[in-house]
């Protein structure tokens, strides 16, 4: 979610919500902790490898010094194998943790992308509605202006012809419109008759 802070009379700046800041802080903390754990694991593995190398070298040269014999036939190779298995399990656990963090970051990026798309869609919708409102006002203004011009023209005509003359002119225009309407109705009837004629002929051809 994005809030806006007004700066000056006509501008506003986006300000991230506290929830987004909290999520970003948590992610930064997780990444920092992950880096520290990796460094610690690498240091432990390095120390363990060094100890095992020294033990193996000492065993090959002098045998185990200052140590008891491996219990019940356990050899140093067995201990080395167990240490390697332990390191392997650690690596697998690290991979799983990295996978979970990557999935979390992926979901976070997808959510942020969805929020950006929604914000863009809302902005486009607001711009479209604003444009439609401006066009509606423009049409209304033109209609009002045109109506005012028509009323002014009728008033001037009435003044010029007088009430009786203007009334006779309106009657003449009404008769002309009625005659035009009758002509259009007759043309429509003629067209419908022709359509019906050809439709009957087609039906007769299909029925044969």
Swiss-Prot record:
<feature type="short sequence motif" description="Nuclear localization signal 1">
    <location>
        <begin position="86"/>
        <end position="91"/>
    </location>
</feature>
<comment type="function">
    <text>Contributes to the regulation of viral RNA transcription by interacting with host proteins involved in transcriptional activation such as ATF4, or CREB1, and by inhibiting their activity. Additionally, HBZ suppresses host NF-kappa-B-driven transcription mediated by host RELA as well as transcription of some classical NF-kappa-B target genes, including IL8, IL2RA, IRF4, VCAM1, and VEGFA.</text>
</comment>
<keyword id="KW-1048">Host nucleus</keyword>
<feature type="short sequence motif" description="Nuclear localization signal 3">
    <location>
        <begin position="136"/>
        <end position="140"/>
    </location>
</feature>
<comment type="similarity">
    <text>Belongs to the HTLV-1 HBZ protein family.</text>
</comment>
<dbReference type="InterPro" id="IPR026220">
    <property type="entry name" value="HTLV1ZIPPER"/>
</dbReference>
<keyword id="KW-0945">Host-virus interaction</keyword>
<feature type="compositionally biased region" description="Basic and acidic residues">
    <location>
        <begin position="69"/>
        <end position="86"/>
    </location>
</feature>
<feature type="region of interest" description="Disordered">
    <location>
        <begin position="59"/>
        <end position="93"/>
    </location>
</feature>
<feature type="short sequence motif" description="Nuclear localization signal 2">
    <location>
        <begin position="115"/>
        <end position="119"/>
    </location>
</feature>
<feature type="region of interest" description="Disordered">
    <location>
        <begin position="125"/>
        <end position="160"/>
    </location>
</feature>
<feature type="compositionally biased region" description="Basic and acidic residues">
    <location>
        <begin position="125"/>
        <end position="143"/>
    </location>
</feature>
<dbReference type="GO" id="GO:0042025">
    <property type="term" value="C:host cell nucleus"/>
</dbReference>
<keyword id="KW-0238">DNA-binding</keyword>
<comment type="subunit">
    <text>Interacts with host ATF4; this interaction inhibits viral RNA transcriptional activation by preventing ATF4 binding to Tax-responsive elements. Interacts with host CREB1; this interaction inhibits host CREB1 transcriptional activity. Interacts with host JUN, JUNB and JUND. Interacts with host EP300.</text>
</comment>
<dbReference type="GO" id="GO:0016032">
    <property type="term" value="P:viral process"/>
</dbReference>
<protein>
    <recommendedName>
        <fullName>HTLV-1 basic zipper factor</fullName>
    </recommendedName>
</protein>
<dbReference type="GO" id="GO:0003677">
    <property type="term" value="F:DNA binding"/>
</dbReference>
